[in-house]
Amino acid sequence: MITPFPVAFVLLCFLNSFLLETEVKADESTQPEFFPLKGLQILTEMNPTQTEDGWEIVEGDIVLPPGSRRKQDKHQETKGIINILTLWTNGKVSYNFHSSVDDDLKEMIVGAMKEWETHTCLKFNEKALDFNYIRFRADKEGCWSMIGRINSIFAGQDVSIGDRCNRTNIIVHEIGHAIGLYHEQSRNDRDGYIHINWHNMPVARYSQFDRGIESPRGVEYDYTSVMQYGPMAFTEKYFQKNTIAALNPFHQTLIGSGMKISFRDSKLVNKMYSCSAFCPNNASQCQNGGFLSPYRGDNQPCHCVCQPGSSGEFCENINDPYEYYEFPPCGGNITSDAEIETPNYPTRKPPVDNCAWWIQAEEGKRVKVEFMDFSFHPRLDKNDSFFYRRCYHERVEIRTRNRYDGDMFCGEDIPPGTVATSAGREFIIIIDTNEQVMEGRGLKAKVSFIDEKAEQLSDLVLTSLLPTL
């Protein structure tokens, strides 16, 4: 049978996609390119490994202050810092702009700060000079920040919004670091939510996925956090292999999709800065994971901020069944013979985009899939591009060997009549796209189940269809 998703699908991201410009440093001849991906998909190669002053940059965009060493700092690498001395006093953050920041970028930075002010008790004040302050600048390479308030003593601490970083959600992300947030994928409890495909990255990059020691103040992991990197972070093969996989395949396309501050981002920062401490009703108990809104200094009671899927004065009402995340608009869990296809097949119409089919065989069986049609946006045909012949625009990840790692297909890679089987009891198909790049007819396939001792075809068939890059 096929278990359908809820009919009502609301995109978690209020923007469907953005174009992130990147340059791959491994190839000096590579020209800056645009590629369409959802949310925070920072290609970690766009940043240097150290600042021009020689300060180390870890996890892609976190600057370690002089005198600190990565291993020494790991004791406080949760999602939110635990050392109150690195929090901004009373939630007041002073800042100014370096002369390299033009008016358009200033407007974006101010907008990003307002996002944090709207959802927390933080206040950003522009000052030419202060004991501690943030200096936004655009003359450095890459997007990066230090974590929390650094005791700079009138010298200021830089937040770099360099070339290719002028995207609001990237700026929100870097400000997140400056107010004390680490990356979501660095949380100590991350293994309960994501799987790291170590074999898809160079050994030298393993340290980029070091974990912290403790969980961040009881706030659950969030795939849609503005602090979560995309699924290909630090991969050796962009648009071919993921490094981060959701334990639940239905959540895969949510990873790094955050276009704005999520509920759990705001909840964590409000806890870090004790934003409800002065609420007249701070003894009020919000239910079902809700929290009191930040106190605004007006002697008015604070209200409960309810997480997605709940409502009411005290968040007492919850949807049945309750889901924090919305599921992909198409796909489902398949446990018996079925025929699957993308919505509106053989055409593709917005706004439906991502799909996920999690096909599971019973004990003693394996999954068999016959592809009747496979038609998506072609592989990139710019032979001067680093991403030449890769699934640059949209991709269909097919996992036949295990739950967390597969190969990416697109165009008409899979001819009609192609038959593939799973190595074990699971066969997963995940379509990652958006309405701006959808092309082709989509996908249509027959699903059936065979004895586990039958011939295994997955590696012989699907892998052989991948082009040599």
Language model features: what each stretch is:
Residues 110-117, 172, 177, 228, ...:
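Amphipathic alpha-helical interaction motifs in eukaryotic regulatory proteins
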Residues 165, 190-305, 311-320:
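Metalloprotease/metallohydrolase-associated module, dominated by Zn2+-dependent proteases
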Residues 3-8, 278-469:
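Domain-level representation of secreted and single-pass membrane ectodomains enriched
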Residues 91, 118-120, 130-132, 155, ...:
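Residues that flank catalytic or metal-binding motifs in active/ligand-binding sites
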